[in-house]
Structure formats: C-alpha cells, structure tokens
C-alpha cells in the first residue's frame, strides 16, 4: 500500500510539473504571437508610410519633369510648328505607298536609284 501511495505522490508531482511546463509554454506562445502581431502591425504601418512617401516622390518627380519640360521648350516657334505640320502631312500622304510595299504588294515606291536593294527588302517584307 505504501508503494501505491508513493507512486501516487510521484505521479501527482509529475502532473504538477507537466502543468507548470504547459503553462510556461502557453505563456511563451502568447508572447510570441503577441510579438508577431506587433511586428506585423509595425510592418504594415511601415509599408503604408513607404507607399505614401513613394506616391509623394512620384508626384514630385512628375511636377519637376513638367517644370523642366516647360523651361526646356517654353513655346515652339511658329516656323517649327509649320515644319512639323508639313512633315506629318507628307508622312500621311506617303503611308499608303509604303504600306503596300512593306506588305510585298507593290514595287519600291521611290525612284529607280535603289532598285538593286528592292529584291532583298521585298523578300524581307514577305517573311
């Protein structure tokens, strides 16, 4: 009977040790999850702060670029605007000829001076 009693005492002590270890582990887990949540919240706040900063920087860069462009070319000269308009009109006029040539449906659109290059260019266009 004494051995059962000592065994019961031993098991009771072991049970108390296990419970204290369990309590200690639960406390560590709580601390760890608390630290992770704190770290996660801190990281989220840092991310939001960085996003706001990056957005401000992008706006500043856009504003600086716009200011630079206006200083670089304040107003194009009328002669330059006229030249640009005539250039684009010429391009639009010649697009159909070149389009057919590049699709391989028409001969080289400009005079005969470059006729020796035509077969190469046309074969390239057909590929």
Swiss-Prot record:
It is found in: Cell projection, Cilium. It comes from Mus musculus. InterPro entries: CEP15-like. The keyword DNA repair does not apply. This is Centrosomal protein 15. May play a role in ciliary assembly. Keywords: Cell projection. GO terms for cellular component: cilium.
């Amino acid at each position: 009977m004494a051995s059962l009693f000592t065994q019961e005492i031993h098991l009771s002590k072991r049970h108390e040790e296990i419970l204290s270890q369990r309590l200690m582990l639960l406390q560590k887990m709580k601390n760890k999850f608390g630290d992770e949540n704190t770290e996660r919240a801190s990281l989220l706040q840092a991310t939001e702060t960085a996003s706001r900063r990056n957005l401000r920087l992008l706006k500043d860069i856009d504003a600086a670029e716009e200011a630079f462009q206006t200083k670089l070319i304040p107003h194009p000269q009328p002669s330059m605007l006229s030249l640009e308009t005539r250039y684009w009109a010429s391009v639009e006029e010649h697009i159909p000829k070149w389009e057919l040539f590049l699709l391989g449906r028409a001969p080289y659109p400009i005079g005969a001076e470059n006729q020796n290059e035509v077969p190469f260019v046309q074969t390239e266009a057909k590929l």
